[in-house]
Amino acid sequence: MRMHLSTLLVLTALMVGSFAQQIREGAKMEVKPDSIWFSEVGNLSTWQKLKKAGNSAEFESYQTKELGARHAWQFTKPLTVKIISFEPQKNQAKVQLLTPGRYLGSTWWIDGNAFSK
């Protein structure tokens, strides 16, 4: 059992690491539709912790509060961004929006899982 768990952990780390290598400064990437975008990294960190904790009621409440306060946004279409920085340990990216429109050039913090693969 212990050997199987170790193998699973190594394979998971390799999969995450291989995708994280694609997320690099200066890269242009597409963000999935309906992803949550944060104006402050602290709000993203809290969102990630609540999501990981598994308490869906608390997570949904926080997300709704952040969206309502305009500390976070949810765009319904896929959008193109430029990676400003990426922290693989935290799975957090600071991005600049490249898709033409009202928010062109704005900077955001997003979860690393928000990128299209």
Feature map (PLM): residue ranges:
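Beta-loop motif signature
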Residues: 22, 27-83, 87
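Intrinsically disordered, low-complexity regions enriched for glutamine and histidine
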Residues: 2, 19-20
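Boundary regions of SH3-family modules and the immediately adjacent low-complexity/disordered segments
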Residues: 21-37, 43, 96-117
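Bacterial N-terminal signal peptides that target proteins for export
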Residues: 1-8
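SH3/SH3-like beta-barrel superfamily modules
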Residues: 72-112
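N-terminal signal peptide c-region/cleavage motif recognized by signal peptidases
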Residues: 15-17
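Active-site phosphate/ATP/adenylate-binding loop shared across adenylate-forming ligases
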Residues: 12
